[in-house]
């Protein structure tokens, strides 16, 4: 189980003699990813590490879309949405051959440690690389809040506030016409976003996948 392995991992840069780290964003983008990238790059550089940006997630890793990052690369990015490293989904990382190739490319480019910003699928890929000897750290970045071992994820707060703005407008119209509105929010198989928005807006009922079997 990747979640227990990630939660129990303890990466010490000095002990592992890490000199170069890579950072990538994978899967769906989430608000705040650029701020996380900026923090990784700036902290890495200030710690005397080489930092390599991996573009387009695991797909970019397999295609060796990798370049050195400087402080200038992350300037004026903290307030921007999306991800400056771009993102993509990568079916090849689900295969043993793809995982082996990704690990070999990390070693080829001298990447001693990899920072993966993404959701559960991204973490699954990171765990596969860890099993192949690549030091990995996962930063939970998903609006769904469906990552084990954490109570908060990058992007969740913005998702709640964005949904709240839309729900407030719908509620005004519903009240004016004496109607009942059913509002669906994102979250896939996790009901956290629905619960937070429902409580904040005083919903009469909140239907979540953890409570109901929709099949």
Regions found by a protein language model. Name each.
Residues 1-8:
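Short, small-residue-biased leader/transition segments that mark boundaries at the very start
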Residues 4, 14-15, 61-116, 153-166:
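Glycine-rich oxoanion-binding loops at beta->alpha junctions
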Residues 14-62:
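N-terminal phosphate-binding or glycine-rich loops at protein starts, especially the Walker A/P-loop
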Residues 20-28, 84-88, 112-116, 181-184:
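Short glycine-rich or small-residue beta-strand-to-loop segments that form or flank ligand, phosphate
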Residues 26-29, 54-60, 89-90, 119-121, ...:
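Short, ordered loop/turn segments at secondary-structure junctions
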Residues 35-40, 121-134, 194:
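Short Gly/Thr/Asp-enriched flexible loops that form oxyanion-binding sites at enzyme active sites
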Residues 116-118, 128, 135, 156-177, ...:
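Accessory alpha-helical/coil subdomains and C-terminal extensions
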